[in-house]
Amino acid sequence: MPELWQLEEQIYAEGFRLICGVDEAGRGPLAGPVCAAAVILPRGLEIPGLDDSKKLTEKKREALFEPVKAAAISWGIAFAQVDEIEELNILGASFLAMNRAIEQLNPAPELALIDGNRNSGINFASRCVVKGDSRCADIAAASVLAKVTRDRYMLEMAELYPQYAFERHKGYGTKQHYEAVSYTHLRAHETLRH
């Protein structure tokens, strides 16, 4: 995992003492909220198996969830719900969830590393890191917390709405999901293709 710390070490060398990684889960699905996490790991800490959550199996993500939280100096997890997504759009709602997650951190970071190429909606000192979840340990840790938390939420929704089989796809578009969604559910997304 040392390669996961290379970029962060360069940032620490600039004089920063406390940085966090921020990532989200749920920007692509057709259903459910967007979930963001912010994590401050101790500098240079290696967590065996830590990587971009998309590269890990569900079982490996679940196995990393508690160790990441236990090892972190601080962590925060927050949602932007469907009504906020519809009001703000998915990017605005992602920023909202990220800001909420960063606000939970104590101590507060001096710099937030945001996965992706946009940070205009972040209310804190921040930098974008494209593919940050596979390049930065703090962002990789945040990606695991966000993905596991959102998946668990969608499992709860599966119990309330069994007709959508959220336990199988977590709200991401599948043929079964498209078939279960009627035109009356599409308010903000008028065109649905499959």
Where are these predicted regions, by residue range?
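RNase H-like, Mg2+-dependent phosphodiesterase core
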Residues: M1-R187
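A short, hydrophobic C-terminal helix/tail in secreted or cell-surface proteins
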Residues: A188-H194
